[in-house]
Every structure is written in structure tokens, then in C-alpha cells.
């Protein structure tokens, strides 16, 4: 199993909660939820039962229709799974709990009983049909699990030293030098291409074959498409999802739903975006109408951009119209030799990094009065009651007209300004020019 940062959060929950809450881990399909939870169960408990509700028998699911006799429930589970449960020393895992809403509702009584600990995993947790007619337990602590971040990817390929050293570089505010920078950029581009889905990472490690890695990612994308069709048989969710790379490549000030779904009503659009967001396959960046430390209070729900939650899946979706993404394309991307403008690939990677760091995504556009075109700040972070605007480029050019205009307009609100680009660390007056591999330290 790959080392995952969320394991430490599981340990923290076990110690702090002492069985007073269940832990609900939300995440997209195939990010590794079940794997890490089962590893946690093996290492930290005397015994455990894992109930995979996507495969559980009808008899097991029916046990949760009447939980008035918990002694009977636990006896039946031990018989079904041939596992002895020990009071306060065993864990029961509800895997894919969205497939059995009554099991999720039972958490209230199970936690109050306090005999065992409970971890739930799921995707599409809040979709209407998955919470219909059940009482959502208040005894849940929710955490999100994302694809492997850059550091977890490096751990997987046997590198435990680069990130701690990069943190020192970031803190020092000095460049690393041309030779080391080239290697760091190539390594980061490798992460952007493979991504953080454990199956794809494992395939890369075992075969070093981009075509096989790409097929794994296509299989995952097809799985997501199947999930979308179960939620929305009309195919609208799938269309919105598939269009994400093209929409970002347009460089428009928002995701233009009308160019994907003609004549769709506003309330239907908002519901579709909420469902995509709930699937954890998509990251939503909202327009901050008034950029300040409280941007969540003034975001425009109707003006947004969509990103994929995994940079590797994004790379594959970019070339979805081909039978497979040829090795030559991967090689050119890896060596920074592809002539296409890849700004949207870099922006998607930055969105993923910021989300993994726990930041909500916001951006801001405003009119350039002389050209009548928009300035755009790609991302805005809230820090210390101020904001940090970020502009992202896929080149090494230190041009930053949008940052400069934003600075003039909101000078009293800004803590730090960042230009993310492909060159080594530099300072351009009061702007920090950072290579993309340092974004994780913002």
C-alpha cells in the first residue's frame, strides 16, 4: 500500500474521538479510500469487519432495516463475516455507505452503543437519492480524501527527501539553480501526467509504460461516466464533465454552460454543478465578487470554473478523442516540447494542489477599461485577514498585467502576490515568481 497522509488523520480521529463519533471519508471513486481504511483497521485494531455495500448480500443490508436489537445485529455480522468483535478494540467499516442509506442512519445508535469504532467511506454521499428518507447522523466527523498529492507521489516512487528540501528552498527565498530546477520541473511534469490515482501510479511504477498508465486512467474516467449516467440518464453531467479541458482552454471568464447544454435553466445548472462537486471528481472555483478574506460570503454561484480533481485524469481527458494518448505526446509533455499552450493543464494542477492544502478555490475578473477586455486573477487565497492573488503561466515569462492591475485596485487588501511559472524562484519587485513545484507551500 502507498503511504497516504490521511492515515495520520485517521489516527488523530481514533485518539480524539474514543468512539464518540464515526468517521466519514468522502472522496471520488478509486482515490484509495477503502485501501487506506483497511490498512488502518489491520494496524490499529484487534479485529475489524469491512462491509462493502456495493457487494454486500441482501441479507446483510436488511440487517439495518431494524436496529432495535444491536446484540442481534452484531451477532449476525460476526457470523456473516466470520470475525470476532472485541468491545472498544474492534472497528466496523461501512464501505461505499451511499449504497445502503439505512446503515448510515444507524450510525447514531451504533455510536451511542459505544462498543466499537466506525468508519464510513463513500462517494456521491449527498446526492438526493442517497439521503432520501433517512436522518443524517450528527455523530459523523467528515473528512475528504483526494488523489495522491505531489509529495505522496514522490513517496510512492521512493523519494522521501525532495519535498523537505524544497520547503527549505521556499523558506530561504532563493533559487535552486538551473540544473536542479530542470530536474525538479521534469519530475513535476511526470506527476502532472501520471496523476495521483493509486492504480495509475502503481502501473507507472511497475511498467514505466505511459500507454498502460493512460488506459488505467481511461478506465477510471469511464467509471465516472457510468456513475454520472446513474445520477442523470440524460447525459448532461457527462457532457459538463467532458467539456472541462475545452472550457479551460477557451480562457473565458467562466465555464460557459450554454455552449455545452443549450437552453438549460439556471436552477438545473446549479443542481448539476452541485452533483459534480459532490462526486469529488470535479473542483469548483467560484468568482469572488469582492476579493477579501471572507470570499465564501460573496462568491457568485452562477459564475464558476471547473477543474478535474486529478491532474493525470485531466491529461487523459485532454486527448480523449483519440483511442489512446500516444507515448509520443506523453514524452513531449514530459520534456516540455509540446507546442500547444498548456496553461490550462498547469492551472488544473495548481487547483488540485490548493484543494489538497485545504484551500477553497476562488478567482476574480475585472474589466480593463482601455482595452475592454478582462483582467483575471486565476486563484485568490485568504491569509491573515488579507488575500494573496495568484497568476499561473505555462511559460517562463514574468509578465503579470493582471496582478499589477489587481494590486492597484485592491492594494490595501493584499498580503503577498504570486506568479506561478516554469522558471526558477525569483523576485520581481514585490511579486514572488514561483516554479509550480513550490505551490504546495503557499
Briefly describe each language-model feature range.
Residues 5, 14-15, 21, 30, ...:
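A cross-kingdom feature that marks ATP-driven nucleic-acid transaction machinery
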Residues 25:
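Hydrophobic anchor at the beta1->P-loop junction of P-loop NTPases
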Residues 33:
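Conserved lysine of the Walker
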Residues 42-59:
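Conserved catalytic segments around the Walker B and adjacent sensor/switch elements
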Residues 55-88:
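Short glycine-rich substrate-engagement loop in P-loop NTPases that contacts/grips substrate
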Residues 93, 117-123, 144:
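Structural recognition of the conserved hydrophobic beta-strand(s) that form the central parallel beta-sheet
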Residues 109, 126-142, 154-159:
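Short regulatory helix/loop adjacent to the ATP-binding pocket of P-loop NTPases
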Residues 158-346, 360, 367:
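Interdomain hinge/linker elements that couple catalytic modules in large macromolecular machines
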Amino acid at each position: 500500500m502507498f503511504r497516504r497522509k490521511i492515515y495520520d488523520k485517521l489516527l488523530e480521529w481514533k485518539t480524539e474521538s474514543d468512539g464518540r463519533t464515526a468517521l466519514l471519508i468522502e472522496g471520488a471513486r478509486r482515490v484509495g479510500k477503502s485501501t487506506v481504511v483497511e490498512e488502518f483497521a489491520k494496524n490499529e485494531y484487534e479485529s475489524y469487519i469491512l462491509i462493502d455495500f456495493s457487494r454486500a448480500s441482501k441479507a446483510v443490508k436488511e440487517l439495518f432495516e431494524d436496529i432495535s436489537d444491536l446484540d442481534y445485529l452484531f451477532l449476525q455480522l460476526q457470523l456473516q463475516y466470520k470475525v470476532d468483535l472485541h468491545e472498544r478494540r474492534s472497528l466496523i467499516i461501512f464501505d461505499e455507505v451511499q449504497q445502503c442509506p439505512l446503515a448510515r442512519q444507524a450510525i447514531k445508535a451504533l455510536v451511542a452503543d459505544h462498543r466499537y469504532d466506525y468508519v464510513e467511506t463513500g462517494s456521491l454521499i449527498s446526492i438526493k437519492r442517497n439521503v432520501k428518507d433517512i436522518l443524517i447522523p450528527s455523530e459523523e466527523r467528515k473528512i475528504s480524501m483526494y488523489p495522491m498529492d505531489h509529495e505522496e507521489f514522490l513517496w510512492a516512487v521512493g523519494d522521501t527527501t525532495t519535498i523537505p528540501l524544497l520547503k527549505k528552498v521556499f523558506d530561504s527565498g532563493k533559487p535552486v539553480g538551473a540544473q536542479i530546477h530542470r530536474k525538479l520541473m521534469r519530475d513535476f511534469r511526470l506527476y502532472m501526467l501520471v496523476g495521483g490515482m493509486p492504480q495509475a501510479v502503481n502501473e507507472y511504477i511497475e511498467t514505466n509504460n505511459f500507454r498502460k498508465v493512460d488506459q488505467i486512467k481511461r478506465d477510471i474516467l469511464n467509471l465516472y461516466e457510468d456513475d454520472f449516467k446513474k445520477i442523470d440518464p440524460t447525459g448532461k453531467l457527462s457532457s459538463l464533465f467532458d467539456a472541462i479541458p475545452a472550457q479551460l482552454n477557451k480562457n473565458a471568464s467562466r465555464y460557459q454552460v450554454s455552449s455545452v447544454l443549450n437552453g438549460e435553466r439556471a436552477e438545473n445548472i446549479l443542481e448539476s454543478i452541485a452533483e459534480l462537486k459532490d462526486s469529488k471528481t470535479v473542483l469548483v472555483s467560484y468568482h469572488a465578487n469582492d476579493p477579501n478574506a471572507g470570499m465564501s460570503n460573496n462568491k457568485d454561484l452562477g459564475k464558476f470554473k471547473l477543474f478535474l480533481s486529478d491532474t493525470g485524469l485531466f491529461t487523459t481527458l485532454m486527448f480523449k478523442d483519440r483511442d489512446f494518448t500516444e507515448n509520443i505526446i506523453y514524452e513531449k509533455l514530459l520534456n516540455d516540447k509540446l507546442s500547444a499552450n498548456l496553461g490550462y493543464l498547469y492551472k488544473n494542477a495548481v487547483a488540485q494542489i490548493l484543494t489538497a492544502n485545504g484551500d477553497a478555490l476562488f478567482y476574480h475578473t475585472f474589466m480593463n477599461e482601455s482595452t475592454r477586455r478582462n483582467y483575471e486573477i486565476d486563484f485568490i487565497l485568504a491569509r491573515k485577514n488579507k488575500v494573496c492573488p495568484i497568476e499561473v503561466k505555462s511559460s517562463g515569462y514574468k509578465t503579470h498585467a493582471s496582478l499589477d492591475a489587481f494590486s492597484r485596485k485592491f492594494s490595501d487588501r493584499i498580503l503577498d502576490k504570486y506568479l506561478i511559472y516554469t522558471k526558477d524562484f525569483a523576485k520581481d519587485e514585490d511579486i514572488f515568481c514561483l516554479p509550480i513545484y513550490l505551490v504546495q507551500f503557499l
